[in-house]
C-alpha cells in the first residue's frame, strides 16, 4: 500500500471506508489503479469487496503520466474484466452518480458494483464528463492535456459569477475528441 501511495496505511483507509459504510454514505467509490507486478494479483480480492458491501470499486488502467508509468505495468481493461469474471459472471449494471467513463458491472446478488476505466486502451473521451481544477485555480478540460483555463481573474478581487460561468463553458468546449495516451 505504502509503495503505491507513499504515505498512510491501509488500516487508516479501511477505517474511513468502514465509517462511511456505517453512516450509509452513498455512493462510496474506491479507485484502484492497476499495475502489473504491483497490485494486479489483488483485482479479484478488491472486486469481491462489493459482494456484501454497497461499494463501487473502479479499476483504472495505469496512465502514461509521472515517474511510475511503464508500458510493461499496464494491465488492459479487458484483462481486468477477464480476471474479475473468474469470480463469477459479470452483468452490466447501472452506474452510480458521478462514475463518468467507467463501464460498470455487478455479480448477480452483489451489494455493490465494479467498474473498469480503460484510460489507455479504450477511447472514452466522448463519455468523459470530467474537468480538473488545479491548486493554482486552473481548470483543465482533459487530464491528458496541459491546456487549462485560468479561473483566478474571475475569482479575485471579487467573484464574477457570470465570467466564471463563461470560463467553465469555454473549458467544456475545449475538451478534446480523443486523448493521446495510447500513443505513449
Residue map of PLM features:
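Auxiliary Fe-S-binding modules of radical SAM enzymes
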Residues: 48-52, 62-184
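Radical SAM/AdoMet-radical enzyme domain recognition
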Residues: 1-60
